[in-house]
Amino acid sequence: MSVGTPLGDGEEVSFSRDYFVEMDVRSEEAYELASEWFDEVVFTKKLVLDGPPDWGELKDELRFLRERYEKVALLLVTNRPGLIKEVKKRNLRALLYVQGGDMRVNRLAIENGVDALISPWLGRKDPGFDHTLAGMAARRGVAIGFSLAPLLSAGPYERVQILRFMTKTWQLVDKYGVPRFITSSAETRWEVRGPGDLMSLGRNIGMDAPRARASLNFYPRRLLKKV
């Protein structure tokens, strides 16, 4: 079953209840396994930056990855918020994700209109996401990535804290209509999870079944229209 969901300006994305997208896997082995469970998979190149990269080399690598995987994202991991704008203004022909955690990075990622901010609560003692950022993310079309990976490596107490922060973030995302997706962010095949497990994560942080499904279908597919 599929229906057309209006996006504004007459644009529609077909919503199929049985079509699922994994937006963030970070190795070939993870990609291969995820491709068995999902209809579309985005391969993510993780880029840790303390300063500007070799732009030519980065473009060449992304070109190779597009040829191999077709749908590619660049995950920027940095403590220097100014680098977000530098990367954003380059024509890299890939989705741009920013790893959340540092509050300055969270804010600058949203202000600069990146495609997605992944786990803004990572390593924090609070969600790293508030009403101001939620409103800005909604206006600028910045998706929030709800990643399973940190939960897999966390101890019991930390896992409870992460789930609490994810729940608070989800409440703001839902209230302000922020784009979102649920992802494994798998770096190995052992971290890959299927659509059912990811929807269960959504339910655990307060999503109802339709919203959890839309976080693996409608919102990811809308984001993929950018590439």
Where are these predicted regions, by residue range?
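Charged catalytic cores and adjacent phosphate/nucleic-acid-binding surfaces used
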Residues: 1-43, 49-67, 82-85, 91-95, ...
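A glycine-rich, hydrophobic loop/mini-helix early in the fold
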Residues: 71-84, 102
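N-terminal glycine-rich "phosphate-gripper" loop used for MgATP/nucleotide binding
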Residues: 99
